[in-house]
Amino acid sequence: NRRERVLIEDKTFVIQGHKLTQEKAKGIVERYLQNKAKKYIVPRATGLAQHLGVAGDITDIRFRKTKTKWGHCTSKGVLQYNWLIMLAPNSVIDYMISHEVCHLKHMDHSKHFWTLVDSVCPDSDRFIDWLREHEHRLYF
């Protein structure tokens, strides 16, 4: 039973597996990032929601690859994250988590919303700028 695995060496993915094709390697990396997203984002999102008093408002946390959004919060309490965000620095991931969880309190981008975001994630402008500058590098 040959095992598939992903190693990261010097910011490079090293994919190990039996009879690897480009498509198979891509699938291995996608599953790796999805699993990493679940392990990293879910506890942080639920912890922040608990801190903000909105943990009961989360009905689900989902992960999917989207073309234009890094995250989304529905009016029904579903938090959705693009698992490609796991290729960003942890500080940027934490900003995205904060942004979507704060929508559970404010379903808009009002002054109240941004004040709340800044209270749990200071310097959020820096992370927004990072995403604007580097987001094209995170897609594959």
Per-segment meaning from a language model:
Residues 1-95, 104-140:
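Active-site-proximal or metal-binding-adjacent scaffold patches in catalytic folds
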Residues 100:
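Walker B catalytic acidic pair
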